Amino acid sequence: MRVAIVGGGISGLSCAYYLGKEGIDCTVFDPAPGGPMGSVTVEGCILETGPESWLAAKPWAEQLIREIGMGDRLAGSNDASRRTYILRHGRFVAMPEGLQMVVPTRIWPVVETNLFTWGTKIRMGLEIFRSPKTLPDRSVADFVIDHFGAEAVDYLAEPLLAGVYGGSPYDLSAPSVLPRFVEYEQRYGSVVVGTFRDKRKPTGESIFKSLSGGMGTLVEALLERVQLVRARVDSIARYEAGWGVLAEGEWQVFERIVMACGANRSAPLLASIEPQLSDLLAAIPYTGSSIWTFGYRREDVPHALNAFGFLVPKPERRTVMACTWLQTKWLGRVPEGKAVFRCFSTDPDVTRHAMQGDLRRLMDIKAEPIFALNHRWPDSMPQYTVGHSARVAEIEGLAAAVPGLHLVGNAFGGIGIPDCVRSAKTTAAAIVAG
């Protein structure tokens, strides 16, 4: 059996690895494999071009990494300094301890914080008296307002989700983005009560995981184990015996095809083969992002840098949406005497002048950086908007009816690296099973 994999991001490369492990002949097509995931070293600092980590609670990425012999390179976040600041009235306010996303699990930190007004604090306290209910798909904003009020959207849900999904809580689907909390609402009424009853025992491990040499080392390791054609797929065709793939002016024939290039790229390739499926894929909206990384002499930064970084809620925002303080979050990434700031925006065209100026204002930095690095990723972040789960179910049903066609990637069952690996492994197993 020959399998074509269109797209060489983490989903496509993982799928190719799992297929190859089972002796399946597969070819990955991508002119720039790895997608946003990559690493560079500047002035001795290990920097990421895209995602910097994954949630340790989701095991699939770590399982893959250990399987390919990279377990000794696993690195956990420096949770001794696990604190995040949120900008409120122009000042950094520490996010209250005990928050699980938007759900408070400790009373006193919420009482003491200056992040919320007393109206919101009282609302959070009374949330435990809610009755169970099941509602149709609704936005994250509607869900959070219903439970904790509008201020919790502005100063928790919006900044937290903007950095992960690049979208607005008024558009994102609560069941797709916050499935655990929606389940608590259905079972207990109160998401606070649900969180307490489902409290997971501390594992003692870091909340985030990465690789000591950078995420790009995972891409490099997978590329050593797969067959790659560094070319863009210009067209695909459905044959009676399988699939045709056109790349670099040459057609190749395969029995199976895995679309791992994103819903937005898969849609036009499938338009003439399965128009209804193509339309549904095209209906998944995408946003882009820009990551500006600035390096400074530590002596030029007056802040103590005693946290993972900060988030800027929309009411306070100019340009920077989120900023990671790299030397605090990841020990060993930044040499002594330097400070590195990884700044995020959903505007792929944001300029250095705008980003650096905003960082200087927020951090009170007067000096010029010793380096500045930009990575732009337009149309890279699928949006799980209201109705997403129903849309994905319909997409999966239509794809299953097309012999030899498979879809993987972050547009469907989870946006993080572990979710992509899980999707790839499941798809590979289905292909092997026939």
Label each residue range with its predicted role.
Residues G20-V42:
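Glycine-rich FAD pyrophosphate-binding loop
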Residues R2-V28:
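N-terminal Rossmann-like FAD-binding beta1-loop-alpha1 element of flavoenzymes
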Residues S39, E62-T84, E151-Y155, A283-Y286, ...:
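A short alpha-helix-loop-beta-strand transition element characteristic
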Residues R83, V103, I107, T120-R238, ...:
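Active-site/ligand-binding neighborhood in enzyme catalytic cores
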Residues E22, D72, R232-R352, R361-L362, ...:
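Mid-domain catalytic core of redox enzymes
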Residues M37-S39, P96-E97, V103-P104, A322-G434:
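Conserved flavin/dinucleotide-binding core of flavoenzymes
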Residues V3, I24-C26, I257, P369-A372:
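Hydrophobic anchor at the start of a short beta-strand
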Residues E43-S131:
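Dinucleotide-binding Rossmann-like beta1-alpha1 core, especially the glycine-rich loop
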